[in-house]
Amino acid sequence: MQTQVLFEHPLNEKMRTWLRIEFLIQQLTVNLPIVDHAGALHFFRNVSELLDVFERGEVRTELLKELNRQQRKLQTWIGVPGVDQSRIEALIQQLKAAVSVLISAPRIGQFLREDRLIALVRQRLSIPGGCCSFDLPTLHIWLHLPQAQRDSQVETWIASLNPLTQALTMVLDLIRQSAPFRKQTSLNGFYQDNGGDADLLRLNLSLDSQLYPQISGHKSRFAIRFMPLDTENGQVPERLDFELACC
């Protein structure tokens, strides 16, 4: 049984958007293949939320900036003794390739946005019970198509996100690996520190404590308050050890 729970908290708007996109893309593949109405609604709801997130900001622009920033950071390690130079060079080339693919890709989400079935389902998702067969006969007949035909269409939809997915995965992996976990101690359920221009907080907490963190702040300063899962009987120890990485 897992004894540590990892919590992640964004310290700026771009990281908040990236984590939401990562979560939604992961959710797209959870219930594949789509074999019934429930699985279809799970998939289309996540597609719809993804498109909503895409429409709120300059996702491509921010990712390109970060890909270039990560290249500059890696270039400072070239020639440093004791550093795996082949690994550094490989990462730089991967980042350059991701930039090239992302620049040449169509507008993020445009392929999904223009799909007729996705558009029809999106219109009904906000209506309680609005995806019944009499509301969406198009979805009803789609669910009765051969499984291979549905699978092929779903794969095409997901593949249209590959330029974004690959760039985002690389960026988030590098950010998450940019800082080690260090042991910290909260006093009376409270901890605060300087963020040091971090984008992301990562916090490991023992499951035995049955506590969760409420985090507030921004890249220069943040505060963590630990709360009991059982609000009536749970207790927060005077001193609580946890692991924290400011990435």
UniProtKB/Swiss-Prot annotation:
It is found in: Cytoplasm. The keyword Cytoplasm applies. Keywords: Cell cycle, Cell division, Cytoplasm, Septation. GO terms for biological process: division septum assembly; FtsZ-dependent cytokinesis. Gene3D superfamilies: YacF-like (1.10.3900.10), YacF-like domains (2.60.440.10). Its main location: cytoplasm. GO terms for cellular component: cell division site; cytoplasm. SUPFAM superfamilies: YacF-like. The keyword Cell cycle applies. Cell division factor that enhances FtsZ-ring assembly. Directly interacts with FtsZ and promotes bundling of FtsZ protofilaments, with a reduction in FtsZ GTPase activity. Belongs to the ZapD family. This is Cell division protein ZapD. It comes from Shigella flexneri.
